[in-house]
Structure formats: structure tokens, C-alpha cells
């Protein structure tokens, strides 16, 4: 085992001595190591472990060890992630290329089964489910069946790959969202294994084929989203080239006040970091406020790193990390390994620690966070809930001005023609009477036509999910209902969410307001919101209405959520439920009533908003380790639709397919490699 730097050391965990490349030992040679940001310490260990004198040299290690926080990035280094995560939309091409490489290997007379990922690769199928059915008890089953019909060949290919390739696993459809499954189950935090026959440990690091891979930063794991070529290189054990980055420190103090959520916090942070400008930079959170921030909140923040503009948004490992690992069913041996390694490696955070040195520092007192939304077109455009109505009306006026001027011009022209035309007399721009499901109602500009509890950004967080359920319960007790034009949906990022909603019996209240589970996948967050009811969509088109959506997602660009929905607002799950009840954006939820109870008394948001203490009590009583253990004990097996697929076996993909995404399994690009043996990468990526 190479140790040219003289930094090999040992620590004890689970009753045995385990080797590691020691940052404290390197600090004896480079004093600056002690004050490096935690994220750069992880990168530095990576360089030390893969230092080979050629691809990665002692000079590379020294350059990072002596990091200048104010220097513009110029020094290129190689980062070798420990594993790769993929989703089905961007991950399929990588597996197609592996299949094509096997074809090429076979054509050259080699052993096709030698082509395998060298680094662990795990693909979660979550990007294909759409909300075709909603608002009914069988919506989940119906959407699942439609999903399999639409993706039959792709899914058969991935199921074949699951059995054909070593070091490659597939989480089947209808299981969860990649980043939430990664957080709750796949992540190791600290890897252990043998290097040259000796027990060793090293940090869990990764790249993923999805920009929100950074959700795992909340667990203290360094990783981010990359393109397909980089992901394939990482799967084959190759390093990724990068410049030593600048690191922005984000200091958190205090506690979140009553009535606010992690969603409000992350929208505040998004606005601050967008104004700062952090493209190409790491963001690292520190400060005593971390001790009051549950890991689920940290994951929500890490998830939105792409919206910040940063490469990653990481939290250090600390007691909260261990608490979450225990809750989510990790073994006692894993917990001891993580803590022992992090402490030995100076990767463990305490409030008493001296702060690392950063390129620049932003500060936020959590007590200053207030209820917020973001929209209507960008996640960084935060709107205070108290100002949401006026802000919306101002933005709506800008959007409808041209339409209304053109309509008025047409009306004036028709009015001068005579003949009793009704255009000028009856038609109101941006409004129409609609009949749907035996109800007739006026649909107009500002109507909320989609209300979606969606995205791992928020569905990974029990506080906001149970908060939504409590609000639904309170609203139901007051006799409030969702407006008939609102398409409601609930798409959890893992089945654990369903388990604790059922245990708490809050699923009944959400379903009573139309929030039935429609799938375990990305759905509305990535634009798979499905069709609107035909009468509603036709009215929006014909009358050029400015329709709205409210979702607990992470992006809200115009047209992303639905082609006919122009204004999209990001909000916490409880606010999604509240706006579904209101049915419109031109409402002041702070001062205007949501509706009336059966006796005609006004009901305000404050009357149904969940109490923070009650949310915590629900978490303590209903979110259990046993739920995680049960759901993830068979996470790679899939349901009957997956198990019953007609899938080929063997080392080669043998199906002739018409699917464009699978056509390149016999790609001609592989044929010019020439005769002779194909060079194989070595285990250490050389």
C-alpha cells in the first residue's frame, strides 16, 4: 500500500484496528490543514489515498493542503468518487454504453463479462411516473400500470442489467425518489473494506446523474451532479478533473421560530446565495445553529444546491448525523465506524470547534426566517406569505396587460360592426364558467389548478409532511374542502412516508382533501404532472387564463410544471394544502379567511396551522426505525409488475428493440477499436 506522504495511521472501531490516510498526520507537515473547510478535508483525503506519483502527485496534495481561500480557482486536481448514483432518465445511456462495450469486447474475442462498473453504481427508477390519475384511492395502482406500459422495453433492459452487471443495482419503479432513497438507505457516510488485503476506511463520496444529488450533502457526504460521460468514467474507476474551488461559509445561529418550516428556511437561503453568487463554488454550513437543525432540514437545504448555483452545499458530520443514521435503520457497527472515523480524521463537528477558514461568510439567524413562497418563475424569487397576494396581483397585471389590450381592441372592432355580437358584452378576459364533475364554477386568472405535495426536497422531511397532514385534519374538522378545479397529488419520495402517515392516521385527512398517493417518484416536480381535466385545460387555453400551481418542489420555471400553467409557486407541504383549499393565489392567507365552517364562521390559516410541539410529538410517536428497516429490506426486489416482466438473462442484451434509448447497445461507435485485447482499467483507476 502506497504511503509516500507518511500519513497512514490506524483507529479503532468495532473491536478492530482499521487503517486510514490521516489528515491530522498531514497537518504535521502542512499546518493549514487544521483550518480547512470540512468539504476540502474530504477532497484532500481523496487525493492522499489515490496519490500515485503520476496522475495525482504530492504536489497536488500540497496545493490543496495549503489552500488559499481568496485565490481564484486555477489548480486542477483529480477527484475519485467512491460510488455513483443514477436515475432512469439520465442513467439509462450509461448502462446502454456498458452493454455496447460488452458487444465490442465479444466482437474482439474477449470475455464480455469483464465489462462491469468498478465503483458501486446504484440506479433508482423515479423519473417516469406521471400523474395521469389523481384524487382517488386507486390512483397509485393506475399510474403504476400506465408507467409500466409506457416504459416496458426500458424497464426490461434495466432489469436485465441488474442481473448482468456486477457492482450495479437497480431500485425498481414505485419505490422512491433517488435522492431520498440515497439518504435513507444507500449512503454509507464512511466506507470500509480492504486495500491490498488490509482493513481500511475512507469517506463516502459520490457523483450522480441528477443535479439534486447534493441532497446527500446534508448527511456530511461530498457529492454533486455530473453529466453522463463523467458518471460513466466514475463508474469505471476513473477520476473527475476539477479546479480546487472557493468555499463560501454559511453561518447559522439560533432556532427556527414557531410557524416556520424547513421550506421557508431553504427559500431564504436560496435567495441569499443567489444574490451572493456562488456558481462553481462549494457552500459549507457551520455555526451553533446546526445543533438545532434536524438532519431532514439539512437534507432539504442540500437538495437545493443547484438552485443556489453552488457545486455542493454540505454539512459536517456530528451527533445529528449519527441520530439520523440510527433512526433510518443503519447498523450499530455502521454508527460506531462513522463516529470513530470522523473523530480520528478531524471530520467531526462540535459547537466548541474553531471555525474553518472560508473564502467568504454569510450569516443567518434562524429566528429571522418567516413563512415564504418562491415564484412565480424562479426559485430564488422569494415572496413573504404576508405579501404574497399583493405581489401576485402586481405580477399578474404585468402578464395580462398585453392580452387584455388585444382583447379590448377586438371588442372595440366588433362593437362597431353592429349585428348584436355578444363578445364585448359578456366575455371577460381570463375568466370562464366551467362545468366539471357535476359542478359549475367560475375559473379565472390566478386559479390554483395544481397543488402537489411532491419532490424529495420536502417529502424526505417528516416535520413538513406530518405538518401537512395535521393541517388537513384541522381543516377537515372545520368543514373546509379543496376547490373542484384543483388537481391534488401526493408523491412521497419513499414508502416510509406512507407508513408514518398511515400510523398517524393523517393519511385519511389528506385523502379527504384529495391528496391521495399517486406514485413514488418525481412526478410534478419534474413536469410529470399529467393532464389537467379536459374542461379546465380547454378553458385555460381558450380564454388565455393565467393559471397557477403550488408545489413543494425545487424548480418552478414557466411551463416546467405544466405547459398551460404560467405561474408556479414553491411552498411547504402545509401551504400546498392551504392553497388547494383557497383555490386561488389572490388571497392574503395571513388576513383573509381560507373559507367558512358549516355555521358560516370564517376560518383562517392560523386556525388550522399545525403547532410545532404537536408536529414533534407526531414525529416521536409515528416515525420509527422499524419502518425504514421494513421498507428497505427488499428495496431492490420490486413489485409484481417488475418481477413478472419478460426479461432476458445472460451477459449480453439479446433483445432486438425499437426503443431509441436502447438502440445504441450495438453502437457502431464501438467497432473501430481494432483487434487485439481491450485495455481494462485497474482497480485503483489507473
Predicted regions and their residues:
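Fe-S-dependent hydro-lyases/dehydratases of central metabolism
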Residues: 1-686
